[in-house]
């Protein structure tokens, strides 16, 4: 099975940087991700339209490019968790995780017996037709796959110390917008309430060797989160990178300076 370089880096105390794929579902984009020097990407299966076929196509290119493919699933159901791994993802990001019981369920669905209850269905996308035997393949899959839980609600903030202490959790990823909404301060990332919750998550992670993480839409905010201790770092989306690049191109060429912009700033994680 493909080695998970970002898992090894995080376990050694390092930091990793990636982005989110939402709309540009041509796997050629993985080549650009690699060329840019990013460590990983995650396909958004919660909010966007990506299918398991898209996941598998991206995984094929990622494996040959040395980029780590992750997927955010819609919810913590066995079907989504296990089948996404069977399609070759090296890690799962689970949204809106809120309790110890849910974390235990996620780990159980993602790990083979005796650690969990994942069914054996390792396909060529995982083994590359180089079968080493069931025991060896299951051991490798358990070792290389990543469990990443999202902190996006007040209940998660309240239970975060117990949640990240569940054996098998590798990293967290704060969803800033959902978290700020749950905290009663929608989109207000200057509010100390937000950073108090964020720092609580970082402290909880550091106590048990889990990598604290976040997905922000700008490098400015991501650097701020990094200063607060985040190490699993995600910035922007495919569409935000395209828009920012095109906007910079138009601004630098300055051939239509008398014409007003046709669109405002993109929102959310854009």
What residues fall within each predicted segment?
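N-terminal amphipathic alpha-helix/helix-capping segment at the start of soluble metabolic enzymes
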Residues: 1-20, 129-143, 199-200, 206-207, ...
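Extended, intrinsically disordered, low-complexity segments
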Residues: 237-241, 245-270
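Alpha-helix-loop-beta-strand connector modules within alpha/beta enzyme cores
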Residues: 52-86, 108-115, 139-142, 190-213, ...
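Conserved N-terminal beta1-alpha1 strand-loop-helix module at the mouth
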Residues: 1-69, 75-76, 108, 147, ...
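Conserved beta-strand positions in the central sheet of alpha/beta enzyme cores
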Residues: 18, 41-42, 93, 173, ...
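Glycine-rich phosphate-binding active-site loops on the catalytic face of alpha/beta enzymes
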Residues: 91-105, 172-181, 230-249
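Conserved anion-binding
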Residues: 79, 91-167, 261-270
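Catalytic cores of alpha/beta
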Residues: 31, 35, 76-90, 94, ...
